[in-house]
């Protein structure tokens, strides 16, 4: 594997899952593979799970690890080409990227959507500059339009907990005080559409995701109807994608907050969320603390998804 930015990069899902469950049984099985190989993790945005689980995955494989928070300690970076750099940014990304590539073997990048220009975000400008100019294999630690390490962990978790071959999986929008990226819902939808699950997306009108991610999923504007008979509930907030509303909050309707009311019409569904989660905005205390909440095993599987991805990137090194 030469990059990991989307579901297509992992190839056949059944073999990726087999590898994940093998590593889950013995996460140090390939501890020699990464000897004298260096992972560089670059964060343009905050992180807890991605930062810790990806570092742990690298250690599982015997790698050296370097972590850089671009906005703390490094020079402020200009990212636009053609800009006269007479402002507060002393360095351009187009120099910084190949320099960082000199010091490592594999690069992970977190760079969220900026919500200033939809094309800039949806062309994955920052991530693609790392792919083009670093000279190293690059993987996404959540970029502008996807979060594949999260989605792979979500799939592993559903496969672990499902009680039927083709579970009904419902992704529901929920309210949040800030406009959050579409990367997690886009990516979850992309991975769910790559399975044979019964996948439904539910959100208020105006929160339609980009069609290339919705794919063949059923979209249901009535949340209670969507929840009927569900086996898994995946809750997430996202800002509007469509038209002039890009990056905007259209609703903070707390009727969409996942509570016992909605969970009561499911098939005793498991509750999932990528975390961090705003309690009593996205989900009530009772639901996220219930025996059906699997948000912690879901977060634990981030170590497994990252170990599989790093293993395949190391194996792909010349
Ligand atoms: C894994 C989630 C990261 C980010 N969450 C926040 C709070 O910014 C998001 O919603 O994309
Ligand atoms: N789910 C996830 O990626 O969490 P962090 O933003 O804390 O890394």
UniProtKB/Swiss-Prot annotation:
<feature type="binding site" description="in other chain">
    <location>
        <position position="302"/>
    </location>
    <ligand>
        <name>carbamoyl phosphate</name>
    </ligand>
</feature>
<keyword id="KW-0055">Arginine biosynthesis</keyword>
<feature type="binding site">
    <location>
        <position position="176"/>
    </location>
    <ligand>
        <name>N(2)-succinyl-L-ornithine</name>
    </ligand>
</feature>
<feature type="binding site" description="in other chain">
    <location>
        <begin position="47"/>
        <end position="50"/>
    </location>
    <ligand>
        <name>carbamoyl phosphate</name>
    </ligand>
</feature>
<feature type="binding site" description="in other chain">
    <location>
        <position position="110"/>
    </location>
    <ligand>
        <name>carbamoyl phosphate</name>
    </ligand>
</feature>
<feature type="binding site" description="in other chain">
    <location>
        <begin position="274"/>
        <end position="275"/>
    </location>
    <ligand>
        <name>carbamoyl phosphate</name>
    </ligand>
</feature>
<dbReference type="InterPro" id="IPR043696">
    <property type="entry name" value="ArgF'-like"/>
</dbReference>
<dbReference type="InterPro" id="IPR036901">
    <property type="entry name" value="Asp/Orn_carbamoylTrfase_sf"/>
</dbReference>
<feature type="binding site" description="in other chain">
    <location>
        <begin position="147"/>
        <end position="150"/>
    </location>
    <ligand>
        <name>carbamoyl phosphate</name>
    </ligand>
</feature>
<dbReference type="InterPro" id="IPR006132">
    <property type="entry name" value="Asp/Orn_carbamoyltranf_P-bd"/>
</dbReference>
<comment type="subunit">
    <text>Homotrimer.</text>
</comment>
<feature type="site" description="Key residue in conferring substrate specificity for N-succinyl-L-ornithine versus N-acetyl-L-ornithine">
    <location>
        <position position="90"/>
    </location>
</feature>
<comment type="pathway">
    <text>Amino-acid biosynthesis; L-arginine biosynthesis.</text>
</comment>
<keyword id="KW-0028">Amino-acid biosynthesis</keyword>
<comment type="function">
    <text>Catalyzes the transfer of the carbamoyl group from carbamoyl phosphate to the delta-amino group of N(2)-succinyl-L-ornithine to produce N(2)-succinyl-L-citrulline. Is essential for arginine biosynthesis. Has no activity with either L-ornithine or L-aspartate as substrate. Also has no detectable AOTCase activity, being unable to convert N(2)-acetyl-L-ornithine to N(2)-acetyl-L-citrulline.</text>
</comment>
<feature type="binding site">
    <location>
        <position position="75"/>
    </location>
    <ligand>
        <name>carbamoyl phosphate</name>
    </ligand>
</feature>
<feature type="binding site">
    <location>
        <position position="278"/>
    </location>
    <ligand>
        <name>N(2)-succinyl-L-ornithine</name>
    </ligand>
</feature>
<dbReference type="Pfam" id="PF02729">
    <property type="entry name" value="OTCace_N"/>
</dbReference>
<dbReference type="GO" id="GO:0004585">
    <property type="term" value="F:ornithine carbamoyltransferase activity"/>
</dbReference>
<dbReference type="GO" id="GO:0042450">
    <property type="term" value="P:arginine biosynthetic process via ornithine"/>
</dbReference>
<dbReference type="InterPro" id="IPR006131">
    <property type="entry name" value="Asp_carbamoyltransf_Asp/Orn-bd"/>
</dbReference>
<feature type="binding site">
    <location>
        <position position="142"/>
    </location>
    <ligand>
        <name>N(2)-succinyl-L-ornithine</name>
    </ligand>
</feature>
<dbReference type="Pfam" id="PF00185">
    <property type="entry name" value="OTCace"/>
</dbReference>
<dbReference type="InterPro" id="IPR006130">
    <property type="entry name" value="Asp/Orn_carbamoylTrfase"/>
</dbReference>
<dbReference type="GO" id="GO:0006526">
    <property type="term" value="P:L-arginine biosynthetic process"/>
</dbReference>
<dbReference type="GO" id="GO:0016597">
    <property type="term" value="F:amino acid binding"/>
</dbReference>
<protein>
    <recommendedName>
        <fullName>N-succinylornithine carbamoyltransferase</fullName>
        <ecNumber>2.1.3.11</ecNumber>
    </recommendedName>
</protein>
<feature type="binding site">
    <location>
        <position position="236"/>
    </location>
    <ligand>
        <name>N(2)-succinyl-L-ornithine</name>
    </ligand>
</feature>
<keyword id="KW-0808">Transferase</keyword>
<dbReference type="GO" id="GO:0019240">
    <property type="term" value="P:citrulline biosynthetic process"/>
</dbReference>
<comment type="similarity">
    <text>Belongs to the aspartate/ornithine carbamoyltransferase superfamily. SOTCase family.</text>
</comment>
